[in-house]
Amino acid sequence: MIVKIYPQNPNRKAIDQVVAVLENDGVIVYPTDTVYAFGCSLKSPKAIEKLKAIRDKDGELSIVCADLSHISDYAKVETPVFKVLKRNLPGPFTFILKASGRVPEKYLEKRKNVGVRIPENPIPQQIVEYLGNPLVTASVRDEDDVIEYTTDPELIHEKYGALVDLVIDGGYGNNEASTVVYCTGDEPEIVRQGLGELVL
């Protein structure tokens, strides 16, 4: 199933349809401010397993939060790190932080860190707001494939439509992933330079 949602003015009925899929252990594909991404509810162990199987990679999953206070529910955020987050979010960044006790074991799998995002795109922002908890997320990206399929929702639907429960057509996406910043040490460390230019 593919659903058209305009990021400039997301339709509440369509967002509710997406939320209903997520609440029923569904996996979706949705637009961000970078590449398209797979997503499921953090509260659904069944959906997290399904997402991992679709992704078929060992790469770490991240979570999408609604705002900075939402991040502090799921990660330990010291004051200097909070200031960096505040300067750069919403935006095309994934910040790696120390996970709090509210992050399910199914997500962590013996890891102590959690990647967090707040994309600058109203579609995922509203999905998380109305779902009431973060999305577990992983980029629709394969280094061995032609990268175009990550930008065109119709092509994504052709490739993954039978594996996911819903694909959101939010227009063409970007073909560059987020900048990944580790904030678990003394200083923020960029481990992957992507679309965003970090402001310290």
Identify what each model region corresponds to.
Residues M1-L200:
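Active-site-adjacent structural elements in enzyme catalytic cores
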